[in-house]
């Protein structure tokens, strides 16, 4: 899967889960399970419930995603 195939959407973090996973509600109302990308993890960016984030979704599994950006 190339970088061009991903779907980027905005969402809001609902709750933190174990192992750096989060339940995120997307703008269209869907809820997905998302993990934190490596760059966010390396830079120690904290993600809390209520934060607005950008999530990358794979076209193969739209129920899981990767958090790639946290809005200020």
Curated annotation (Swiss-Prot):
Keyword terms of this UniProt record: Cytoplasm, Initiation factor, Protein biosynthesis, RNA-binding, rRNA-binding
Organism: Desulforamulus reducens (strain ATCC BAA-1160 / DSM 100696 / MI-1) (Desulfotomaculum reducens)
Superkingdom assignment: Bacteria
Family the entry assigns: Belongs to the IF-1 family.
Localisation: Cytoplasm
Protein name, UniProt field: Translation initiation factor IF-1
Self-association state and partner proteins as the record states: Component of the 30S ribosomal translation pre-initiation complex which assembles on the 30S ribosome in the order IF-2 and IF-3, IF-1 and N-formylmethionyl-tRNA(fMet); mRNA recruitment can occur at any time during PIC assembly.
GO molecular function, one term: translation initiation factor activity
UniProt domain S1-like: residue ranges: 1-72
GO terms under cellular component: cytosol
Chief place where the protein resides: cytoplasm
Cited function: One of the essential components for the initiation of protein synthesis. Stabilizes the binding of IF-2 and IF-3 on the 30S subunit to which N-formylmethionyl-tRNA(fMet) subsequently binds. Helps modulate mRNA selection, yielding the 30S pre-initiation complex (PIC). Upon addition of the 50S ribosomal subunit IF-1, IF-2 and IF-3 are released leaving the mature 70S translation initiation complex.
């Amino acid at each position: 899967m190339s970088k061009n195939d991903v779907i980027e959407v905005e969402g809001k973090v609902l709750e933190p889960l174990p192992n750096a996973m989060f339940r995120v509600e997307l703008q269209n109302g869907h809820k997905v399970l998302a993990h934190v990308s490596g760059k966010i993890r390396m830079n120690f960016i904290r993600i809390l419930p209520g934060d607005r984030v950008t999530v990358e979704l794979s076209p193969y599994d739209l129920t899981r995603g990767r958090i790639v950006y946290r809005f200020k």
